[in-house]
Amino acid sequence: MAQGLVTFADVAIDFSQEEWACLNSAQRDLYWDVMLENYSNLVSLDLESAYENKSLPTEKNIHEIRASKRNSDRRSKSLGRNWICEGMLERPQRSRGRYVNQMIINYVKRPATREGTPPRTHQRHHKENSFECKDCGKAFSRGYQLSQHQKIHTGEKPYECKECKKAFRWGNQLTQHQKIHTGEKPYECKDCGKAFRWGSSLVIHKRIHTGEKPYECKDCGKAFRRGDELTQHQRFHTGEKDYECKDCGKTFSRVYKLIQHKRIHSGEKPYECKDCGKAFICGSSLIQHKRIHTGEKPYECQECGKAFTRVNYLTQHQKIHTGEKPHECKECGKAFRWGSSLVKHERIHTGEKPYKCTECGKAFNCGYHLTQHERIHTGETPYKCKECGKAFIYGSSLVKHERIHTGVKPYGCTECGKSFSHGHQLTQHQKTHSGAKSYECKECGKACNHLNHLREHQRIHNS
């Protein structure tokens, strides 16, 4: 009655010490269920083997093994230390009866060397990376890794959430996702009390307190708390952009940027403001938008004390103090503090207006102007005065309006000292000193120093 040994390293799943310690009892039970299922599937592939064995386990025995293993964690607690089980999969012989191949697992109990030691399989005998994907050529050291990887090509997502119908490629992804609906956060930081859905998130979070940054870039020496941060950072050195949009061909160095970009094509805006209902493509845009309602301006200039809702606004503002204008137009030589201003300016020379209103067809040379224009059609007035409740389409209009309540007149004439609340008022006033009359009537040639004076004059011709 010889039995042939079959390695199951290609279907085994190993956890590190750190990962195993983070699993709760339910997750460990799930692990054993998955392992048993994998073993059963492997054995079922060898139904044609004809051996003899009078001591094959019945289906009842298999269920007893499964039930016994599920209680292993609870039994280990009563013993005061952890026990782990080692499994050896053997190819059973077929008896003269009507037995089919079943799984023989010889569980050998032994105490763990350290608290929370994960289960270990026996030594592997196959070559590393011997399982290759026929679609992309990527190789794996285990068969189950290849099986999981192939779901990327097939698009198969067999694990569906009953709450929201979202589907996943792997069962552990579904388990983690379901915590979003239950609100379960079993992993709590002992230092600050912050709780997490997943143990891996807690492990990474703890590095904030310890200052540990184990992932270091070999090119520049910069260190990171997470491995994926290092991977993303290294693409700055290599220029690698692995993630390509199938709709327009644009490539990205980070997958989350591709996900956000795809929403431009799909029109999806999953992040909605509860105050005004406005929706956004990405969460960071919603956070920034909320500051309009709260008035929060966390980024303050150390030179003048002016505060901003976004850090890039502060960076741009600081160039006012330094006088820096590094972006110069090649057509006319005009220089700008910000690259975006140069791009917009160049459209004056080219006549390009890429931003078109779908309601009326009017086109603009920058997206911001289109966004503001669209509010004329929607009636949206997101900028509200806290003093009187008056609302405005544009933020600049609110700033100007607030000066009525504060009495601030920041625009002073250097000739006579007279101050104004708006810049255009000062510009018009200065013409009284210079004698400039820039508004000329096309009918009679008369010139005026104010646009409203020209309009009043033109009524003479119209009447």
From Swiss-Prot:
Per UniProt, the C2H2-type Zn-finger stretches lie at 131-153, 159-181, 187-209, 215-237, 243-265, 271-293, 299-321, 327-349, 355-377, 383-405, 411-433, 439-461
Listed under GO biological process in this entry are: regulation of DNA-templated transcription
Q: Where in the cell is it found?
A: Nucleus
Where does the signal sequence lie?
none
| Glycyl lysine isopeptide (Lys-Gly) (interchain with G-Cter in SUMO2) crosslink residues | K109, K400
Q: Give the UniProt keywords, A-Z.
A: DNA-binding, Isopeptide bond, Metal-binding, Nucleus, Repeat, Transcription, Transcription regulation, Ubl conjugation, Zinc, Zinc-finger
The text of the family note is: Belongs to the krueppel C2H2-type zinc-finger protein family.
Q: What name does this protein carry? A: Zinc finger protein 331
Please name the source species: Pongo abelii
